[in-house]
Amino acid sequence: WFWNDQKMEVKSYVEIPCGIYHSEPDRIRYRGWFINDEVLISHWTAGVSKDYPWEMVFEALLRCGGNLVIPGTDKNSRIYAPIASNMGLMVTHHHAEPLGAEMFLRAYPDLKPSYLKHGDLFDKLWQEAVERQKDEEVIWNIGFRGQGDVPFWENDSAFDTSEKRGELISNIMKKQYAMVREQIPDAVFCTNLYGEILELYREGCLQIPGDVILIWADNGYGKMVSRRQGNHNPRVSALPEEGDKGRHGTYYHVSFY
């Protein structure tokens, strides 16, 4: 096999004993990877093609029992999402690219990425992303971060309090949620409580639709606390509290590029 240089032997037939097999549902419904080291394989062909290493990553995920993938970011996600879907994987999105939309500065490099000034253009990118993926199996990631995976207020200084920041993110999530629901009534949603978003959530400044899966992240070193960079307090708990309702997930870093 590719990852351990195993050579597959072709057999003319395979015997499968007759019988009844009972399989239990997986305890974790959605199980997958984000290819965090995508830049390390983006120019690798393994002597075959640029797609081949990605196909082998997706195959490895399937062999490990996974069913979901974030197939890279930016241009990569639009190249490799169809390959992942064709191999039977569901697709979701990096939290810096809600709904899998194109980054604002990629689409409008000469404009300031301010939702106050250009909200209609952000909405257009999100709507285009919904149209592009509406016929695929997608877990829709909603939220709002700044360009380059930073807090959005680094691009828009008008939002200078937690209340203002949380209100805008909450309103945007509701809008994204409605966009998808209009096209896909039974859509599944998630959002990442990571970095500054975790702080706003803990402060009670975020209003998230009740059926959205809340994804909690470790700090990059395996501890379920706030991110090691850019947070005011690096020890904020990043786990749901006892009695919390709704659905929850974990974004756990095996590597941190």
Predicted regions and their residues:
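Solvent-exposed alpha-helical segments and adjacent loops
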Residues: 1-59, 63, 147, 175
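Gly/Pro-rich turn-and-neighbor structural signature
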Residues: 6-16, 74, 78-86, 113-245
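Active-site-adjacent "gating/activation" loops or surface patches in catalytic cores
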Residues: 28, 32-33, 37-51, 215, ...
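Hydrophobic faces of well-ordered beta-strands that scaffold small-molecule active sites
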Residues: 31-35, 62, 68-71, 91-94, ...
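Glycine- and acidic
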Residues: 38-45, 66, 111-113, 153-163, ...
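Catalytic domains of carbohydrate-active enzymes, especially glycoside hydrolases
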Residues: 49-79, 83-92, 135
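Acidic/aromatic-lined carbohydrate-recognition and catalytic surfaces
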Residues: 86, 90, 94-119
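Active-site clefts of carbohydrate-active enzymes
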Residues: 103-107, 148-154, 244-257
